[in-house]
Amino acid sequence: MGGQQADGLPALSLLPHLRRARDLADRRYADPLRLDELAAAAGVSKYHFLRAFAAVYGLTPAAYLAQRRIERAQDLLRSSNVTVTEVCMLVGYSSLGSFSSKFRQLVGVTPSEYQAKFADGAPRIPGCYVFMHGLSDRKRDG
């Protein structure tokens, strides 16, 4: 599997395998994912995976995962009454400082400022409902 086309992009035969790894990152974004796990899902070495993923998606796997986590955090901050600290943990960050820094870098405002923008909108989903009904996407059987 593999090789590259003349334009430097990964061979078309590799695309479904990269998609499989990206789907894994999408499903398990809140879990600590390692590069070798994602590369194994694609069936290539981690070094080849890193280059191919970045060439196809325009982001490294780590940057893609961070972006996915922040997108999910935005959803939770907009639509639920879960605290910023709870959102931080739900989307896979173990440090509120790291989460807030990455959120501000990608969104342009702090998580608290972002959440405050939506405070007067439609009624928000209670945090207890988010946790009870698995809306946080976290696996319970882990």
Protein language model features and the residues they cover:
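Alpha-helical bundle regulatory/interaction domains
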Residues: 1-48, 55, 60, 72-101, ...
